[in-house]
Design a protein with these regions (language model features):
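Conserved beta-strand positions in the central sheet of alpha/beta enzyme cores
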Residues: 4, 34, 59-61, 88, ...
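Alpha-helix-loop-beta-strand connector modules within alpha/beta enzyme cores
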Residues: 46-63, 110-114, 140-147, 201
Length: 201
């Protein structure tokens, strides 16, 4: 298993100085990073900084807006330039059957396009993805049943949704290549591992 840092965790640094943030992450001993935006920096600059600090990209959190047809080629080119083979959709509003249907359709269109470029598509869950819609659909279950998208399981949000993260990972291990391991206070208040409500050991 490889460990890395999600750059969103140090967003106060990345927003002002992505290069400096990468340097500090490397000095902390990390070898892998997951980007949550590039703050307007070019792929060439990001690649050079990764090489300078001996870092590798595990993946990126890329909003669905950056995967629309009009910008998809640009997004793919950027990821290939920095050596990233995994794109993760960090969030989608899936509160109704209509929203789920539209998302499923888009995901099923994106997957083969990305696969043709050597890139895998993942979805990062929040607690709301386990909440039934008014029509009785559970978003996470619908994605598993109706698409081949991979999952990046957020253990904290899975726990907040009153699911057992360990059992969920075991049940869907073939669809899970990445895990977000974190802690918090049962809401959006983050805590260091072991300092929140999640049973992290």
């Amino acid at each position: 298993m490889k460990y890395g840092l999600q750059m969103y965790s140090v967003r106060d640094l990345t927003e002002h100085d992505l290069r400096g943030a990468l340097q500090q992450v490397a000095e902390m001993g990390y070898s892998f990073v997951e980007f949550a935006g590039f703050m307007g920096n070019s792929a060439e600059d990001v690649k050079s900084w990764l090489e300078e600090y001996s870092l590798q990209v595990s993946s990126t959190h890329t909003p669905l807006a950056e995967l629309e047809d009009e910008v998809l080629d640009q997004t793919i080119a950027y990821h290939k330039a920095i050596g990233c083979k995994d794109i993760i959709i960090p969030y989608a509003k899936l509160e109704t059957k209509e929203q789920i249907d539209a998302f499923v359709e888009r995901v099923n269109t994106l997957i083969p396009k990305l696969q043709a470029e050597g890139i895998s598509l993942h979805y990062h869950n929040h607690d709301c993805d386990f909440a039934p819609t008014p029509e009785g659909l559970v978003p996470e279950e619908e994605l598993l049943a109706r698409t081949s998208i991979l999952l990046e399981v957020d253990t904290y949000w899975t726990f907040v949704a009153k699911q057992n993260p360990v059992e969920f990972i075991r049940q869907h291990k073939d669809r899970i290549h990445m895990i977000h391991l974190k802690d918090g206070m049962g809401d959006h208040t983050g805590k260091s591992l072991g300092q929140g409500v999640a049973p992290v050991k």
